[in-house]
Amino acid sequence: MTEVKAELVGSVWKITSKPGDQVAEDDVLLILESMKMEISVTAPRAGTVKEIRVKETDVVKEGQVLVILE
């Protein structure tokens, strides 16, 4: 399993995947908003989305686990 973590502090603007989705490396999993910029969080490898640990509008901190891939 792979943990996809936030690289910065921000809020979850849009979730673009759901548990069970098959994703390829670099597919966008969700979009964070930080300092009026949109930052795409992408899959580090191909796999299946097992769990999404945040919801839209959540505030996340650097290093927080956002998505679990298997």
What does each of the following model-derived ranges do?
Residues 20, 37, 57:
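Surface-exposed, flexible loop/turn segments at secondary-structure boundaries
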Residues 6-9, 46, 54, 62:
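ATP/adenylate-binding site constellation spanning eukaryotic-like Ser/Thr protein kinases
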Residues 8, 14-18, 22, 51-54:
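Short histidine-centered loop motifs in beta-beta connectors
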Residues 3-7, 50, 66:
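Short, basic/polar N-terminal leader/transit segment immediately after the initiator methionine
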